[in-house]
From Swiss-Prot:
A Pfam cross-reference name: HIT
UniProt-annotated binding residues for substrate: N28, Q84, G90, Q91, T92, V93, H99
Protein name: Bis(5'-adenosyl)-triphosphatase
Residues the record marks as active site: H97 (tele-amp-histidine intermediate)
PANTHER family: BIS(5'-ADENOSYL)-TRIPHOSPHATASE (PTHR46243:SF1)
Phylogenetic classification of the source organism: Eukaryota, Amoebozoa, Evosea, Eumycetozoa, Dictyostelia
Gene3D superfamilies: HIT-like
GO CC aspect terms: cytoplasm
Length: 149
């Protein structure tokens, strides 16, 4: 069985819905909006500048594919991609990760309010909720594995 970490935390395989050789995506413990997921390199590196070219490319190609699927699945009409790269940028987990958040018109009064929400402390959801979402997302990537994004 594969062991996956997000920073210092062991991630249950049931929370992961997408993997490549170099990246993985997981559902978010404390989502800002429905469909808020994270994509990370498998290698734990603290900053974007620490990624290899291959990891950087794979991470963003994965983000592109994941965003397309979650936007459609959660009936969004836009995506917010967010990276907090370094402590002074708001990074709280020293493992590069991209927040992928499906958006809808008027989901916030001010569009940029989402960045404040990412920074706020939020209530964690249950592992059962996370596993349910992950199990809904996982087959969508099988269905779309040959689709060009």
């Amino acid at each position: 069985m594969t062991t996956t970490y997000f920073g210092p935390w062991l991630i249950r395989q049931s929370e992961i819905f997408f993997t490549t050789e170099l990246s993985f995506a997981l559902v978010n413990l404390k989502p800002v909006l429905p469909g808020h997921v994270l994509v990370c390199p498998k290698r734990i590196v603290p900053r974007v500048k620490d990624l290899t070219k291959e990891e950087f490319t794979d991470l963003w190609l994965s983000a592109q594919r994941i965003s397309s699927v979650v936007e459609e699945h959660f009936n969004g009409d836009g995506i917010t991609f967010a990276i907090q790269d370094g402590k002074n940028a708001g990074q709280t987990v020293e493992h590069v990760h991209i927040h992928i958040i499906p958006r809808k018109k008027f989901d916030f009064e001010n569009n940029d309010q989402i960045y404040n929400e990412i920074e706020k402390e939020r209530e964690p959801r249950s592992y059962e909720e996370m596993e349910k979402e992950s199990s809904e997302l996982r087959p969508l990537f099988e269905e779309n594995k040959n689709k060009t994004f």
